[in-house]
C-alpha cells in the first residue's frame, strides 16, 4: 500500500528462504520494505489475505496465520477494518474471495460458508450488511471440496477492479453473470 511491501514469515519453515530472494527483488523497486519479525508464534502466508485498498479492508484467514501475525500486517497496512474468517481450507482463498467493482471498491463477496466457522460466517454477513453488498454462497465443490472429492477452486481468485479471474466457473452460472 502506498509504496509499502510487507515480507511475511511463512508458517512452513522451508519457505522462509524465499524471503531473502523476494527482498532482493523488492529493493530494486525502491519500495519501503517491512519484514515480519522472527518471533515465536508470529506467522502469515500471502494466500491467507485479501487487501482491498479502496475500502481499506483486510480479510484474513487463520489456518496458516497466527493472530499476532495478522495484527502485524493490519497495523503495517493501517487498515480501517480487519475481517477474520476461519474455515476448513488451507488458505482463506480456498473458500472466500471479495469482488471489486470497476472503481476498485468491494461490491460483493463469494464464500463457501459451509466451510466457515459460525462466528466467521456471522462476521462476514455483518461486514456485507454494513456495505449493503451481496454474499454469494457457493458449495464446497466450488471451493476446496470435501474429504471425498477435491473441489474446483473457483473461489481461489484474483479480484481486480471490474474483473474476477478464477480458475473455474462457479457451479451456479448465475454467480458469474452477477459478478
Residue ranges of predicted features:
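The feature marks the mature, well-folded catalytic cores of soluble enzymes
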Residues: 1-179
Amino acid at each position: 500500500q502506498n509504496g509499502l511491501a510487507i515480507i511475511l514469515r511463512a508458517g512452513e519453515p522451508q519457505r522462509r528462504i524465499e524471503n531473502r530472494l523476494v527482498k532482493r527483488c523488492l529493493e530494486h523497486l525502491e519500495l519501503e520494505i517491512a519484514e515480519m519479525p522472527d518471533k515465536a508464534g508470529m506467522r502469515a502466508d500471502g494466500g491467507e489475505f485479501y487487501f482491498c485498498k479502496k475500502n481499506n479492508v483486510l480479510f484474513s484467514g487463520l489456518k496458516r496465520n497466527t493472530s499476532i501475525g495478522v495484527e502485524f500486517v493490519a497495523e503495517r497496512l493501517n487498515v480501517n477494518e480487519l475481517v477474520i474468517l476461519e474455515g476448513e481450507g488451507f488458505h482463506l482463498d480456498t473458500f472466500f474471495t471479495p469482488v471489486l467493482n470497476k472503481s476498485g471498491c468491494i461490491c460483493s463477496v463469494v464464500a463457501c460458508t459451509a466451510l466457515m466457522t459460525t462466528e466467521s460466517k456471522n462476521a462476514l454477513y455483518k461486514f456485507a450488511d454494513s456495505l449493503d453488498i451481496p454474499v454469494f454462497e457457493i458449495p464446497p465443490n466450488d471451493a476446496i471440496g470435501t474429504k471425498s472429492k477435491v473441489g474446483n477452486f473457483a473461489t481461489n481468485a484474483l479480484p481486480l477492479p471490474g474483473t474476477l479471474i478464477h480458475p473455474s466457473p462457479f457451479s451456479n452460472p448465475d454467480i458469474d453473470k452477477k459478478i
